């Protein structure tokens, strides 16, 4: 009897080993859906972005008007724009769930997969920031001015790099025209990095909630996990369409519906909600260079997780102290997100400083110390 085409054809064979016959631990929970949801979000963002780019004009005199043209005059342009604008919020929600699952269940022990994932996170942040600038509303313009100006804190070469980024001595037409092609290009780089991420993942094998050896109990990806992923897809699309159709501007800053004006500063400059935790850490340090270092360290600290891990048990499923530390970290992230949306005044500055110190303390001291204590309790 001839083998199925999916097992014989050189291209289909690769797809088959990735999406059909891939053996996975049978006890994977719903938290393992976030990876496939990220893939769906990326596809949606690329497709809607391509159609939006057909009608967008990367010029400071026309950028805001071209966005309004898309909303008013292009067939279903309003739908494309709001799906794209709200899709990035769901993208980051899925990404934070994915990172949180990795921290909780010890995915950082698969070092290559974890490091590529953190790089993916960084590239996604850059992509989203440049896309936010393209609207050329008030908050877009001033956020671009403030965030890019932080690079000037780098000793000796900072000012030169900022002027190179701007294409002049301020955020202007050159800045917008170079941000647009980079924003168009980066999603394809993200897709390539995602493939590398999957290659490393399939090479090392997926972990599972209990961190047990799963070689004795595995199930094929299709039809068990494709069915579960499909349920996640339906829920994600329902959430995205609900946002785009019923609450299209709920997650956008009202200031961004005003055309950019370099002569009028908004009362409170802030990035989109998914960057607020990092923004709160940035402004909690009064020194400019110190704030930039803290901002970058808030993301790069994820690279240190494999080195800081002291636990003999990979997963947190049977480690109550580590579970408490993890949820304390999640609470701090919510607090920092809330503080980032508040004015720079007492008591928000003080709360931000305390939450920032605790954020880094949990990563550098909290998790290793708690894991060492659990090792003594469990294995002594």
UniProtKB/Swiss-Prot annotation:
Organism superkingdom: Eukaryota
Family annotation (InterPro entries): Cyt_b/b6_C, Cyt_b/b6_C_sf, Cyt_b/b6_N, Cytb/b6-like_sf, Cytochrome_b, Cytochrome_b_C_euk/bac, Cytochrome_b_N_euk/bac, Di-haem_cyt_TM
Keyword Cell membrane: no
Cross-referenced CDD domains: cytochrome_b_C (cd00290), Cytochrome_b_N (cd00284)
Cofactor: heme b
PROSITE patterns xref list: CYTB_CTER, CYTB_NTER
Binding site for heme b b562: 84, 183
Xref: SUPFAM superfamilies: a domain/subunit of cytochrome bc1 complex (Ubiquinol-cytochrome c reductase), Transmembrane di-heme cytochromes
Single biological process term from Gene Ontology: mitochondrial electron transport, ubiquinol to cytochrome c
UniProt keyword terms in alphabetical order: Electron transport, Heme, Iron, Membrane, Metal-binding, Mitochondrion, Mitochondrion inner membrane, Respiratory chain, Transmembrane, Transmembrane helix, Transport, Ubiquinone
Residues involved in a ubiquinone binding: 202
Ranges annotated as spanning the membrane: 34-54, 78-99, 114-134, 179-199, 227-247, 289-309, 321-341, 348-369
An example Gene Ontology CC term for this record: mitochondrial inner membrane
Gene3D superfamilies: Cytochrome Bc1 Complex, Chain C
Note describing how the cofactor binds: Binds 2 heme b groups non-covalently.
Pfam families for the chain: Cytochrom_B_C, Cytochrome_B
Keyword Isomerase appears in the UniProt entry: no
Localization of this protein: Mitochondrion inner membrane
Task of the protein: Component of the ubiquinol-cytochrome c reductase complex (complex III or cytochrome b-c1 complex) that is part of the mitochondrial respiratory chain. The b-c1 complex mediates electron transfer from ubiquinol to cytochrome c. Contributes to the generation of a proton gradient across the mitochondrial membrane that is then used for ATP synthesis.
Description of how the protein assembles with itself and partners: The main subunits of complex b-c1 are: cytochrome b, cytochrome c1 and the Rieske protein.
Family: Belongs to the cytochrome b family.
Record's miscellaneous remark: Heme 1 (or BL or b562) is low-potential and absorbs at about 562 nm, and heme 2 (or BH or b566) is high-potential and absorbs at about 566 nm.
Protein name stated in the entry: Cytochrome b
């Amino acid at each position: 009897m001839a083998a199925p085409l999916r097992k014989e054809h050189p291209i289909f064979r690769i797809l088959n080993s990735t999406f059909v016959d891939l053996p996975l631990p049978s006890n994977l929970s719903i938290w393992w859906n976030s990876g496939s949801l990220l893939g769906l979000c990326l596809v949606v963002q690329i497709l809607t972005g391509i159609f939006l780019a057909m009608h967008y004009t990367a010029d400071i005199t026309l950028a805001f008007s071209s966005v309004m043209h898309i909303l008013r005059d292009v067939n279903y342009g309003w739908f494309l724009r709001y799906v794209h604008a709200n899709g990035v919020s769901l993208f980051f929600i899925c990404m934070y769930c994915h990172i949180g699952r990795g921290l909780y269940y010890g995915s950082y022990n698969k070092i290559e997969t974890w490091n590529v994932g953190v790089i993916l996170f960084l590239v996604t942040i850059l992509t989203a920031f440049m896309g936010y600038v393209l609207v050329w509303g008030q908050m877009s313009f001033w956020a671009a001015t403030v965030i890019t100006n932080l690079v000037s804190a780098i000793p000796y070469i900072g000012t030169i790099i900022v002027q190179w980024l701007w294409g002049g001595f301020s955020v202007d037409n050159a800045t917008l025209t170079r941000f647009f092609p980079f924003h168009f290009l980066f999603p394809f780089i993200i897709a390539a990095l995602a493939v590398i991420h999957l290659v490393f993942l399939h090479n090392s094998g997926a972990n599972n909630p209990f961190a047990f050896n799963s070689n004795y109990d595995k199930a094929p990806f299709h039809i068990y996990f494709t069915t579960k992923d499909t349920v996640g897809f339906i829920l994600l699309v329902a959430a995205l369409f609900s946002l785009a159709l019923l609450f299209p501007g709920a997650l956008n800053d009202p200031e961004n519906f005003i055309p950019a004006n370099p002569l009028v500063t908004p009362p409170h400059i802030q990035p989109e909600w998914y960057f607020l935790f990092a923004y709160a850490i940035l402004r909690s340090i009064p020194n400019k260079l110190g704030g930039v270092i803290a901002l970058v360290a808030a993301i790069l600290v994820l690279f240190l997780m494999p080195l800081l891990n002291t636990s003999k048990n990979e997963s947190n499923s049977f480690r109550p102290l580590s579970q408490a530390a993890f949820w304390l970290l999640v609470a701090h992230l919510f607090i920092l997100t809330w503080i980032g949306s508040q004015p720079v005044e007492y008591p928000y500055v003080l709360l931000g400083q305390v939450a920032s110190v605790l954020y880094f303390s949990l990563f550098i001291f909290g998790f290793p110390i708690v894991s060492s204590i659990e090792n003594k309790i469990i294995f002594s």
